[in-house]
Amino acid sequence: MNNAMKRTPALLLIIAAPLLACAQLVVTNTQTPAQLVQNTLLGGLVATNIIFNGAPATAVITQVGAFNSANSNVGIASGLILSTGNVASAIGPNNGAFANTILPNNTTDPDLVLLANGQNIGDAAVLRFNFIPTGNTVSFRFVFASEEYPVYVCAAVNDAFGFFLSGPGISGPYQNNAVNLALVPGTGTPVTINTVNSGTAGNQGAAANCAALDPNWQANAQFFVNNMDNNNPDPTAVRYNGLTTVMTATAQVQCGQVYSIKIAIGDAGDDEYDSAIFLEAGSFSSPSMAVDATAALPSVA
């Protein structure tokens, strides 16, 4: 074997190494929630009164970070991640222990409790801010992921998350008359582990629990990505056992008025098995309303 042939395998490894590194989800935890909202999440809007878990969002928090997943299976290239555990636990592959962070805080949220049918909520990550829409709609793109898939599909208790919008013209059942924007596409059904999954109840669940939330729950399998239950060696896979496809949260709003959004996620029933929300960078936007600037010309007799 000549020297050129001997060098070939080493050269291939050198070339392949950056590709392998780029294929994995990258999560950073160096910015405050306020910085992440303003610099990463928002697209052309300005946030005010940014609060995380009831306090000014001016400290770096392990439950909030930035991510780059251009070559992973999240489906969103980059953005903000919010988790019931340490956001670093999202990094795959998904072929080892569960992402299962037990946090020292006991944060809860009444709207998540309502979504979880009165179950206790812990390890909550609650990010709230105000904004003024520049158009008559507001929208953003997201993916929900959880370690509770597939075992706890159709279980009596599931981790909960929601996007609670309040402000002029909004009337809903949550705090400050908010509505939840985290809905199964084309429906008014909240996105949960029991409404978006593979269509099969887990061994800790019963199909009746899923059917009680949505009689057509099995049809929602089209919005689910199976991540192979801790048995996926693919380096592009995130660590959670299942995740949704990319979805869009949207609402009608009044241009120029002040609105509040609360992005919240929490562990239900216990503090085990992390869940997370991936929010697309720059997608939180309110397209400006078109103005017809054409002047009417006087008619000529």
Question: What residues fall within each predicted segment?
Answer:
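Aromatic (Trp/Tyr/Phe) and Gly/Pro-enriched flexible surface segments
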Residues: Q24-L297, A301
